[in-house]
């Protein structure tokens, strides 16, 4: 009986300890920032405002100061001020715009010595944002010549199965494809539904960076034969030391600045041509269904998805998320943001060894906005207003140029990332495009 009593007492003590250490279901200081227009879109000349609702331990904040700064997208602040919480709410008025674009507000407040921060952007007539980049008269001729030359280079494909990365549903292989010129290779992962059937094919180009890429089997799980590629000539089995060496070789990773002096030698020429070579490979596969070809990616991958769809008529649809490389001359026009890598952005420390005019002449042949003008197939496009990597001003300028059928999924609160729900809608849309 005594042992039973002691055991019961011990169990009760443990229960008490666990109850005392139950993690909170929300932070002690909890706040949300809400634009005065529910869709975060304003007409030109409208006054933009944010409502900040904050609680600490379930009680509304009182007499706590909110500091804020505001300005045009990715530009220095032109407005600053303070407001005070009353009954858990503070209203921050942060100005307007008289030209189409985006405006940000950065705010902060302190509770018990802890600083809480948020940044939010709102749009002003975003559908009216127009390009700053020139549209060269010989743009199409330049790319036709480039692709004609690149097509003469044999593919010389090597495929190495990777059973350790495969599953009963998806077969994964390492791929090496010669592209653009002899000795230049694209490396990637081929992921195939492991069912012996024929399937649509999907090209999946990468985000920016000289880095290791990983397989993306989820597209194959959705029924797409997928080629996930790198663009910087790094084999999938490269060592960390080899990747570091490649980073140093490619301007410490800033490869977007290589070859700005001339459109014929700019770094992205072989990258863009390589996208078409990847489609050559995909449509040659025996389990390709012979009909459906898609491309999808985010950031640099979103940019390359637009480029591929514009250059290769075999592509039937694309899904592009917050594309980089859009309207690259934006920062040269004063209060206007340009796309990643944000040439001439305020505070940029990159050395540019050519004239600004020459740089933008070169870039006009590579600006994704000029490829967006030439899209002829349906597209799914998605971005968020709070993106500081690929500013929404640049993304919106490019998407506005697309005249082909398009679905635009805007999630104002997202930044350089997207919600799982957005992915689900994009995947469903891509499946629906397949015949």
What are these regions (language model features)?
Residues 1-22:
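Bacterial Sec-dependent N-terminal signal peptides
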Residues 254-299:
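Gly/Ser-rich "nucleophile elbow"/oxyanion-hole loop immediately N-terminal to the catalytic nucleophile
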Residues 389-435:
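C-terminal catalytic histidine-bearing segment of alpha/beta-hydrolase fold enzymes
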Residues 36-38, 151-196:
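N-terminal cap/lid segment of alpha/beta-hydrolase-fold proteins
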Residues 211-273, 330-339:
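Cap/lid segment of the alpha/beta-hydrolase catalytic domain
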Residues 375, 381-383:
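Short beta-strand/loop motif that positions the catalytic acidic residue
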Residues 302, 306-354, 410, 418-421:
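Hydrolase active-site cap/lid region
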Residues 20-31:
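Proline/serine/threonine-rich low-complexity linkers at boundaries of modular beta-sandwich domains
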